[in-house]
Amino acid sequence: MARYIGPSCKLARREGADLSLKSPSRALDSKCKLEQRPGQHGAVRKSKLSDYASQLREKQKVKRIYGVLERQFRNYYKNASTKKGNTGENLLQLLETRLDNVIYRMGFAVTRPAARQLVSHRGVLVNGKIVNLPSYHVKPGDIVALSQRAQKYLCVQESLTIKDQHGSAFSWVEVDSEKFSGVFKALPDRADLPSDINEALIVELYSK
């Protein structure tokens, strides 16, 4: 499956937002002008978009945050719409339960792309078995751990150091950094998830 491998700043400028594609220790610098679109002479972002444009931009932003392509994202929406409860919240929960995202939330990788690579390289176990599919959905109660080989990766050590420095902790995961493992305790509530995502716009887009 194709993945974007270009500059993360370009994507951030396209969406006008920090997509968490860089390590917290390497925040977007002054060269990444979020108010301007990509390109040598990117036009300053317009203050007002049409309803459709706003819905489309929100979908693109969320896709890029979680590293999901269009077809897969649409399938997530279809799945979310068949579940009980709020479709938008269901969609975010499906994205949050992806294995690469769980690895990122637990602090074993500084970005989701780094977490995806860790999973793809067979460095992650779920309930004692290696899982190399980033889109694998983790369930409440699952134990996620790094393989002995992955525990020695410098990028993992650096990520855990950054996690400790920034104090990033999420209530729906419990992590034992010394054992390089964690428990996915429960599905996150909407209040626990990023407030800068407006999932209602995505629901409106796909409901047309």
Curated annotation (Swiss-Prot):
SMART domains with a match to the protein in the record? Ribosomal_S4, S4
Q: Which terms does the record give in the GO molecular function aspect? A: rRNA binding; structural constituent of ribosome
Q: Which residue numbers delimit the S4 RNA-binding domain?
A: 97-158
- This protein's source sits in the domain of life called Bacteria
Q: Name one GO biological process term.
A: ribosomal small subunit biogenesis
Mind listing the UniProt keywords for this protein, alphabetically?
Ribonucleoprotein, Ribosomal protein, RNA-binding, rRNA-binding
Q: Name one GO cellular component term.
A: small ribosomal subunit
Q: Does the keyword Disulfide bond apply?
A: no
Q: Which InterPro entries match?
A: Ribosomal_uS4, Ribosomal_uS4_bac-type, Ribosomal_uS4_CS, Ribosomal_uS4_N, S4_RNA-bd, S4_RNA-bd_sf
State what this protein does.
One of the primary rRNA binding proteins, it binds directly to 16S rRNA where it nucleates assembly of the body of the 30S subunit.
* Self-association state and partner proteins as the record states: Part of the 30S ribosomal subunit. Contacts protein S5. The interaction surface between S4 and S5 is involved in control of translational fidelity.
HAMAP family, sorted: Ribosomal_uS4_B
Q: What family, per the record? A: Belongs to the universal ribosomal protein uS4 family.
Q: What is this protein called?
A: Small ribosomal subunit protein uS4
Origin organism lineage = Bacteria, Pseudomonadati, Pseudomonadota, Gammaproteobacteria, Lysobacterales
